[in-house]
Structures are given as C-alpha cells and as structure tokens.
UniProtKB/Swiss-Prot annotation:
It is found in: Membrane, Clathrin-coated pit; Early endosome; Recycling endosome. This is Phosphatidylinositide phosphatase SAC2. It comes from the Eukaryota. Disruption phenotype: Animals develop normal corticospinal tract and raphespinal tract. Mutants show greater axonal growth and functional recovery after central nervous system trauma. Knockout mice have normal cardiac form and function but show augmented hypertrophy and reactivation of the fetal gene program in response to stress compared to wild-type littermates. Keywords: Coated pit, Endosome, Hydrolase, Membrane, Phosphoprotein. Residues 593-760 form the hSac2 domain. Its EC number is 3.1.3.25. Highly expressed in brain and hypothalamus, expressed in lung and pancreas, and detected at low levels in liver and heart (at protein level). GO terms for molecular function: inositol monophosphate 4-phosphatase activity; phosphatidylinositol phosphate 4-phosphatase activity; phosphatidylinositol phosphate 5-phosphatase activity; protein homodimerization activity. The modification Phosphoserine is found at S714, S827, S830, S879, S882, S908, S911, S1103. GO terms for cellular component: axon; clathrin-coated endocytic vesicle; clathrin-coated pit; cytoplasm; dendrite; early endosome; neuronal cell body; recycling endosome.
Amino acid sequence: MELFQAKDHYILQQGERALWCSRRDGGLQLRPATDLLLAWNPICLGLVEGVIGKIQLHSDLPWWLILIRQKALVGKLPGDHEVCKVTKIAVLSLSEMEPQELELELCKKHHFGINKPEKIIPSPDDSKFLLKTFTNIKSNVSAPNKKKVKESKEKEKLERRLLEELLKMFMDSESFYYSLTYDLTNSVQRQSTGERDGRPLWQKVDDRFFWNKYMIQALTEIGTPDVDFWIIPIIQGFVQIEELVVNYNESSDDDKSSPETPPQDSTCVDDIHPRFLVALISRRSRHRAGMRYKRRGVDKNGNVANYVETEQLIHVHHHTLSFIQTRGSVPVFWSQVGYRYNPRPRLDKSEKETVDCFCAHFEEQLKIYKKQVIVNLVDQAGREKIIGDAYLKQVLLFNNPKLTYVSFDFHEHCRGMKFENVQTLTDAIHDIIIDMKWCWVDQAGVICKQEGIFRVNCMDCLDRTNVVQAAIARVVMEQQLKKLGVMPPEQPLPVKCNRTYQIMWANNGDSISRQYAGTAALKGDFTRTGERKLAGVMKDGVNSANRYYLSRFKDAYRQAVIDLMQGVPVTEDLYSIFTKEKEHEALHKESQRSHQELISQLLQSYMQLLLPGDEKFHGGWALVDCDPSLTDAAHRDVEVLLLLSNAAYYVAYYDDEVDKVNQYQRLGLEDLERIEIGPEPTLFGKPKFSCMRLHYRCKEAGGYFHTLRAVPRSPEEDGKDTLQCIAEMLQITKQAMGLDVPIIEKKLERKSSKPHEDIIGIRSQNQGSLAQGKSFLMSKFSSLNQKVKQTKSNVNIGNLRKLGNFTKPEMKVNFLKPNLKVNLWKSDSSLETMENPGVMGNKVQGESDGDISSDNDSYHSDEFLTNSKSEEDKQLANSLESVGPIDYILPSCGIIVSAPRLGSRSQSASSIDVSTHAPSEAAAGPGSELGKGLESPLKKSPSADSIHTRTGFTKPMDVYCQRFVQDAQNKMNDLSEIRSVAQKSEEGSHKTNRVSNEETQSEPMGQTPPRPSQLNVSCSVAGPPFLSVEPVHSVLSQKTPSSGSSLLELEAGLCVTPSSESSSSRAVSPFAKIRSSMVQVANITQAGLTHGINLAVAKVQKSPAEPEAVNEIQQNELKNMFTQCQTRIIQI
C-alpha cells in the first residue's frame, strides 16, 4: 500500500480504500480513495506492508504511527496460508514534525526513474536556521522558566530513548509474525471448533496473543466492516516451517550447514521417500509481558510472566496433526532483584495472599485446556527451593483432580552437561504423553483431540524449559509419524530430519530467550546438536553476563515500551534511569574493584585457614576449573582458588551457593610434573580462552591434572598472560626447592583427569575443624547429593530424655558432635538431624537463604550434651562417629540409594517399591524394641514401644492438612513433646499417630520385575535395622499382641518392617517421624526408569501430654476444611 504525506494527515491507500491519520490529534479515519484529491499537497513517500498501530510514548507527547516497512516470508502453512515475519518498521510522528529518513521502498507509479522519494521538508541547513529563529523568537517573547525548559528537554530525550528501544524491539529481535489469511493466535484444535464462524480474522483471534490489540484499538472501535482490511493481528513469538524427507539412506549435512541454519534438502525425485511438513509456532501472551527481572510470577488477575504457547504442526498429505505445550513463570508472587549477578529469588506475598491469584490462573488454564500436567524443573535444593516449595504447596491447596504435578530437578539429573538424561523424564511420563493424545484433522473434520496440556517451567522458563519441551514434542512427533505410516515402527527419526528438528527447537528457544532475557538461550548447543560441548558452556557464561548487564538499565526502557504497547501504566520512574545510566560506568568500575577486594579477602582468609604455620604464602588467584568432567550443569563452571606456598599448592573449590570454600586439595610441589598452557580444548569453533593444565602425580601414579583458566577482565582478553605469570610463579617456587618443572605451550587435548583423591572437606564454622573425605566428586557432581540431603533424619533418641529441662518455648538445640546435629524445629514438632557437611559438601549452618533450615535462632550447648549423656550413650555416640555413610546400587534398576544412617529414626521412602493395591496393615515387630543400653527409661514402660493409636485417615489431603495445622496451631507442642519424653518413666504413656496414604497407579506386583526385598547393608553392631518390603500375608501372619496395635494404613499395600538381624542393638521404628509432607515412592520398571506415583506421607504425631480430645477436634476441623487431595504428585 502507498503512504502519502499531506499537510495535516498521513494517508495510507490501497485500491479503493484509504486510511487517514491526523497529524494534529492522532485520530484515524476511513475514507474513500478519491478523497486523496482533497488533501493539501499530498506526496507519496513510498510503499508499506501494513499497519501495526499507534503508540504514545508520553502523555505530553504526540502519538506515533507504526507501519510494517519490510516483511520476510517464513513459509506456507497447510491450506497455502503465507506466514510473514516483520523485519523492519517505519515510525511516523502524528504531529507537525517532519518525518525522518524512512527508507521506504519507492512507489513505481509515483517515483518512476527516481532513486529517492521527493520530500516537502526543507534542507537540513534551512531546518536548523528556521528552528533557531523560532527558538529565539519564542525566548524573546516570553522568557520561559528554566525548569520548564529542562523538563521539556528531558521529555524529548526520554522519547528518543524509548523510540530507539521500540525500533530495536521490532527490527533486531525479529520476533513479530502475522498472516493475512491464517489465525496464528489459535491452535488447530481451537480453530477446528469454530470453522463455521463467519467473522473476520481479527475478531476470531485469541485475545491472549493478539499483541497489537491495544495499539490498533482506534481502528477496532470504528466498528464498520470496512475496517477489517486494515487490522492485522500480530503475534510475538516464533514461527519456523520446514519440509522434511524421510530418507534413511542420506547422511547428515553437518559439514555443509551451520548450526543456526538447517541443511537445505535437495529436490527428491524419488516418491518412495515420504515428505512431511513441520511447523513450530510459539505465541507469547500479551498479559504480564515484559523482561526477565521486571516481570516474574503471577499478577492479581492470574496472569503469569513469560507465558508462551508452543504448537508443533505435522502435515502429511491432507492430514494435519497438532500438539501444543505451554510455559509460564511459577504462579506465585515472587521476584528477583536484577542488580546482582544471579540474584536470589524471594517471595513477595504470603501464602494466603497468593491462593486466589494461583486459583485464577489455573482455573483459566483448565477452562481452555481441560487438563494440566505441570512439569516443574526448578532445583529442589539451593536458592530455587523456596520457589519450588511454594509452588507445590499451592498445588496441594488448589487440590484439583485435573492437575498432575511432576517435579524433575533438571540440574540434579543432568549434572556434568549430561542433558541427554532428559530422556529419564520423558520415559517416566511416557504414559501421560500417550494418554494426552494430540489433535488430528483431515478434510472430513476432526479425528481426535488433544486432552490436556503440558505446562513446563523452570525459573526463567527459557533454557531448561526449551530442552524439556523439545524432548516431549519429539516423542509425540515420532508417535504421530508412525501412526501415519511415514516412519517405520522400530526406526528412529532419520539423521537429517533429526538435525533439522533440533535446529528448529533451538531457534525457538533463542527467540523466546531474546524476547524475555535479551540474549540467546543457554544450552542451545544441546538442543541444536543433541550434545553438550565445552564451547557451549563457555558461550553460556558470556550470555549469562550479558543478561546481567541488560537487566540493569536497558531492560527498564524495553519494559516501559512493552507496557506502553499494551496500555499498561508505566510504574517505574523513567527519568531516574537517566541518572542511573550515567552512574552505570562508575558503578561498574566500583563493582570490579569490589570484586577484586572480595577475591583478596577470600585469598587472605583461606590462606590463614588452609596453610599450616610452617608454610609461607607466595600467591593466590581466582580461577575457573574448566575440566569437562567437573563442570557443574547448574552453574556451568566451577570457581576455584589457587593458593601457592613454599611447599605446596592448594586447589580450593568455591561454592557460590553459600559463598564459601567447602572442599580443597593440597598438592606438594614435588608432585607437580609439568605445566601446559594453550587454547581451550574444543570440538568445534575457535577457542575463546587459554587454559593451564597442571599435571601432578598421586601415590606415584600419573594421569591427574587440573585444567584452569583465568577470568578475563575484558571480552578481548583470553587470560593467557595471567596463566603465564602463574606458571612462572609455580616454576620459580619449585626451583627454590632444588627441583624444576617444565612449562609447555601447546594445544590442550580434550580429556578428563582421573578422579582426584585426598579431597579435604571444610566443616561448618561452628566446628572450626577440617575433616578429610574421599567422596568429593560424588557429593558435588552426582545426582545422589540432593537425595542424601533430603533424606537426612538421624537422631540419637537416647540423648533426648533430659531435654525437658528447657524452658524456652521456641528454640533449636544443636549438639555439636563431629558428625551429628540435633535440631528442635520451631514450626515442626519433630526432632531431626543433619549430617556433617564435611564429606557430602553440605552448606554451612546459618546460610543466608535458609536452604537447609528455615529457623533463625539456635541454642548450642556442649556442656548440656556432656552432662546429659550416660556412659552407654557415650559409647553409642562414639560408634556413630566411627561409621560413615555407605551408598549402594539396586541392581534391578540401576538407581543409587543411600544407606540408612546410624541412629536414624526414619528412612526415605523413595527407595521402597510399592506395587500392590490391596490395603494392608504394617506392624513393627520385635525388632522395634529399644536396644540394650537405651532401654532405661523408655523401655521401663511396658507399652512404650507397642501402644500406638490407629488413625483412620484415608485421604492424602487429610494427612497433609494434619501436618500443617499442627505446625501452625501447636508451636508449643515441641516443648511439651520433649518434656513428655523426659517424663516417660513416671507417666508410662507414649502414643504416636502415624498416618500415611498412598495413591498408586502401578501394575500388580506379579507383573513388576523382581528386585531385592531388603537392602542387606553390612554395618557395625550398633547400627539400626533396615527397612524391608514384604508381602502382605507375611506381615499379617507375624502380628503379635504386642505389635498388633502399631498399625500403618497404606492403600497400595506397603508393608514395612524392621529387620531382626540387629535386634541386640537399639531398633528404630520405621514409622518414626518423617518431616517432609510429601514423600515420593517410585515404581521402577525393567529399564530402570521412574514412573512416578504420588504418596502423601505426613506426620501426625501428637504429644503424649496433649489431651486426645483436642487432637480429635483438630482432625475434624481439617476434614471439614479440606477434601481429598486429588492432584497427582510425581517426583522423578
């Protein structure tokens, strides 16, 4: 269409239609094309593709008209519908201000033989002269207030800055798409329900994804049919369309194409190889739209940040198959202050304030998609845990049977760049994927519909989310192609097709990431190639730094533009950004100085801590250990401190989760064999960094080394100079000992070191000592680490009989033993312990974000521990100190499990297999009696170990509620419970309610593969019995009068009994207090894959001193307040 400039209007004309845009008030008018003759001196400026809308960047400034200046054809969807991408826009001020250089395509009708369009604006020199004259006249007539002049200049500066950001948003990201004949906002399934709807396209669109709805509002309000021609619905997101050929004889075109662009298929003349069309369409919601650190979580209307619906289309002949997934921020009120690199998330509102908005979000989702399968990928420990816990709690409170909650700790399962382990997730939920189906449409109509949707999220809903969504969509696509006969049943996707498919999803992730975070997606190399390379790790580090910079100031302008586009009031003081921008350079320099000071402090403190008194400190450096075998998937690299003394060098591993060093290694200089310096080992691309490899011998054996690189001060540096200085220092120091070490410059080989030995763990600050452990690699990089953290509940009950002397109502008691710590939880009527963090790499007590404990106040007393222990207790305590954790492997499923810790009162249920449905009763046998040496005073009571109260809960939600009501309403129970334990010998009444409920969908036990019924773990005599799983009939036949009253109702027929092998020692009841309100029991198939089944095991342990009537009243209140928990919970 042609664009004309007149004195009072800009006129868009195509055929017999014309749209007049006022340059005085910004009004839009539909007029016939013949009215162009009435315009004052119209001049054709060029051709445009369409109208996006208009925007006002400030209330005191004029409107701007946004036009599509240039488009690019993306491809054609089934039905020959063209999809175009907006590549360039033109912005016109609807004021008397003359337009700038628009660079429009010239109209051949009005500009034949002319290279540039004619202008009615004067020359630049004349413009400046007239502007200066006008300014002088204005200043002479009315001397304006200097303050007003300053404000006017600030407004103009702000407008220019926002206008610049608007142009970048449309022209740099290439994330806006439209089609004149196809509804990109609606999926195939939603379109199929309204095929007979005769309304125009813009009236049938999904309001959530109609990105320019507010900007085009002046046209939609006109209401006449003539306006339909001018309204073009635009989506923000991603669209890519590719045609693939199923040919197993072709090889990959890796050498002929770059990872960013898929290989071009040559024309297939052989009809034997079937073709199919693949289209990927991602639509970003316009509600709560914005940038990463500006928009998080949910708003008051239930809209979440970064909400994207992604549809994968497969078209074969006349069959169109569609599968959709969504992503969106965790729907609770949370935020991250983006002025710190990798800031910690925080909850902004309480649980009660969040419930209504959480319900509003999922009620809308269920209304649209019927069912929701939530796949939560946030870390289940560390700084992300607070968000994951809040999410799970809201899901349980929402309590809807149409929801399924799947928890998959992505970083835990994919440590060490093993992103192919995502298959563990897809295999575990394979049945859910198949049951969800997909939409299938042909010429006759709808064949089947997709029943439900996957809602995948991580913290940002970018990197991890894209990898998982691509994996799920791949499973669906293979099922679809096999269903249509395009792929053989037992064959995978051809290499060439697979590569193109991976590239499409990687491009999708990059596009969404640019829109939300400002940079390309991390982990994109895995999505693109299926492999995680060291170059991708380093690239991720650069992108993380870029995201941090962008979030500081540039995002503020981008967020303001997005809000203005959507008609949302701009809440941030944009004028203050000017000052912040000026301060940015100084702040950046200051932060660099602060960083150097922090490193100096760290080096000084750990030099004093690690170096013996007889060694002299020669130097220290902060480096990065880039050995691929040590690379942590959660943080992409491992920061280390390299300390050098006159006799040894120390490699101290820094944990940024707790801002401290938790493990280190001391290596004598005499064992240093050689030093290699060269480009980083990469498989593709040009190396960006130089690395230093320190080879050393351990116990006269070689093959050990550390691969380190320096942190460059600028992007242009590779850190080689720093590494050479370090190498020379090492060489000079060793020469002072009368030895020498060669320094070799060469390209480093891509290989991994042998597992480092003699790793020393630094214990908690409270203990102030060092413990040596040899499980550093396992604790820091294996998936066992978090499982061990979550199943730690070791308690020496023998030490608790004198705890009744305490009078403080809320406190936490820490017994400062070398490897045992007892916590009295304020909000949890339980006593638990946490293992010594020295070996397993746990966080320091008192961590700022409360990853391990949410309690703030603690009471430490070594004297109390000494005075309260008997000689027998001390002997048992000494035996506990001498035994460390042992880990085992279940051979039937290949899952690493942690052996029960000595003195534990409970064991994780995650290693117990449950596969029967018949309800049964589990009883504690004779092995549950208290061991010799601990029977006084507990065993003096004849029924102390056998009298239990059977609670008839059959609903998981009742159990869940029981726990939280006790926590909320009975904070004093902790004290009363402890006192009652101390007075057991006089009162003689010890009653414990244990309730657990299980919902399982596994197969009968006879159909599951055999696996060991008991973990036969060798241990010392003082060790407790281990949990065992036995058939139902065996337990019923073993019940005795003394144990028959100790019951545990399990819907799935789980029967857990203590082993009798260690009956001579103190036996720990398997039904002891489980602090977690949600424990997952998984059914393991022959392939070793986890099919999650939810088991809600909540503690319902009332104080013996508490009146039973009070407890019954609370239980009745819970049953009236909550119904059965119908949400399926799966933890993988």
